[in-house]
Regions:
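Short, intrinsically disordered N-terminal pre-domain segments
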Residues: 1-40, 100, 394, 415-430
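Short coil-to-beta transition motif at edge beta-strands of beta-rich domains
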Residues: 56-76
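Long, low-complexity regulatory tails in eukaryotic proteins
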Residues: 259-430
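Small/polar beta-strand repeat architecture
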Residues: 4-10, 16, 32-53, 76-249, ...
Length: 430
């Protein structure tokens, strides 16, 4: 049985930058979802007696255990493809899990951290918008629109000040013919207001009264240390340094975790989108989910990004504030307003309570229901942590042959300064 190479992750530890600049999120998504991250030149490549590949690189690779490497331009051509990093003996050497026993490399090619497998369907001339979709879509795969615009289409009725908090407006659509094709009431969207299909993409008002978007993916904001702190998007933010982040997933779903306040590296929030494992027939209702900071606060409204309902941040805080978006289960009327999903794991204390502290990996799946009383299914990849591993940054773990990473999340107000977090399952290392 071959080693799984579908789920990939990226981190700031790879040398990627997420700073206080407009465009940083889109550039990061381009790299992680579409292009991948090239490694430095390969000085030698060999196949050992077990059939694994050893790469010696000209400079530091900054790659992490269990990331996926894509090889191109090698001879014989059978060498080209995707491989899991099995070992990192030093900063310039990688060992890739392969099944190439008895083969030899005659020509060395190039290597990169493989992308998650998406493509850019549309981009705008000003380079502030993207529409992504998986490279091999089925009818269930949505178009993923990411918009960092600061003004309304007329450039006057809505203007967001560039020094305010940095976030993109993000949503899912069933079909698109151009980058701003989001006003058709007959096309499914998430989030969706049937009386105002463009609601997620609107910028209205100016100055401190501006409202920009609805489902927001933040990457730089004056953040909170506890439930009692509240800040506005217009509040001054730390403009120095690069944020910490992890982006993990595959062609079906991915999650983006980052610390919106650069001074608090472990206080990450989670956003994400894609398909979930539904208990319902997908011909009746699309199995989409979308997580972010769901709010329509003005730029000067004080709120806590993580803990304050009705503002919601995916799986953070509580059953009230930790909701995410799914399409409403109404097969007779699919073009209806979205509903909210709730994790079925009690307490929203993933990675905080030591319920099974003796287990190397205490990971369970994430079943969830919705506000209308329906059980909906399970989230892909992400797992509830039933112990506090005390990791300080993204950490690869292997349990028998199962590969995981663990990442911190500041997810429960009752826990004070105790960091929670999630496991993410990446498949089997065979």
């Amino acid at each position: 049985m071959a080693t799984d190479v579908d789920v990939q992750f990226f981190s700031h530890l790879n040398g990627l930058v997420l700073s206080n600049n407009w465009g940083d999120l889109i550039r990061l998504l381009d790299t992680c979802l579409v292009n991948g991250l090239p490694l430095t030149a390969i000085t030698s490549a060999t196949i050992d007696a077990q059939g694994d590949i050893t790469l010696n690189l000209y400079a530091e690779h900054k790659a992490l255990l269990f990331q996926v490497i894509e090889l191109q331009g090698f001879v014989p051509a059978s060498i080209n493809g995707k491989y899991r990093i099995k070992g990192t003996p030093d900063s310039k050497t990688l060992i890739l899990k392969a099944e190439l026993k008895g083969q030899a490399i005659t020509t060395t090619g190039t290597a990169k951290l493989a992308s998650l497998g998406y493509e850019i369907i549309f981009r705008d001339p000003n380079d502030v918008k993207r529409v992504y979709r998986t490279k091999n879509p089925t009818v269930e795969h949505p178009f993923i629109r990411v918009d960092e615009s600061l003004t309304s289409p007329d450039d006057t009725s809505g203007v967001y000040t560039s020094s305010y908090a940095k976030y993109a407006m993000v949503g899912l659509l069933e079909n698109m013919t151009h980058i701003d094709d989001y006003e058709n009431p007959e096309v499914l969207q998430l989030p969706f207001d049937s009386t105002d299909p463009a609601k997620n993409w609107k910028i209205t008002g100016t100055g401190t009264n501006v409202i920009r978007g609805w489902n927001r993916w933040y990457w730089r904001k004056r953040g909170e240390r506890n439930p009692g702190e509240q800040y506005a998007d217009s509040d001054s933010i730390n403009t120095n340094g690069s944020g910490q982040f992890t982006l993990i997933g595959d062609q079906n779903a991915f999650y983006f975790l980052t610390n919106i306040h650069v001074n608090f590296p472990n206080r990450k929030i989670m956003m994400g989108c894609g398909l979930f494992d539904s208990i319902f027939d997908k011909s009746l209702i699309q199995n989409w989910f979308l997580g972010g900071v769901i709010t329509q606060q003005t730029a000067t409204s004080f709120y806590n990004t993580i803990y304050n309902s009705p503002n919601m941040t995916m799986l953070c805080g509580s059953s009230a504030s930790g909701k995410f978006l799914v399409l409403k289960h109404d097969p007779a009327n699919p073009l209806t307003d979205h509903t909210y999903a709730n994790c079925d794991i009690t307490g929203y204390r993933s990675g905080i309570n030591d319920l099974h502290s003796n287990s190397l990996v205490a990971a369970t799946s994430f079943p969830f229901g919705d506000d209308n009383g329906f059980l909906r299914g399970n989230l892909k990849h992400v797992c509830f942590s039933r112990k506090n591993p005390l990791y300080q940054q993204v950490t690869p773990i292997i349990a028998e042959s199962s590969m995981y990473i663990y990442e911190n999340l500041y997810n429960n107000p009752a826990a004070g300064d105790v960091m929670g977090g999630f496991y993410f399952y990446m498949g089997e290392l065979e």
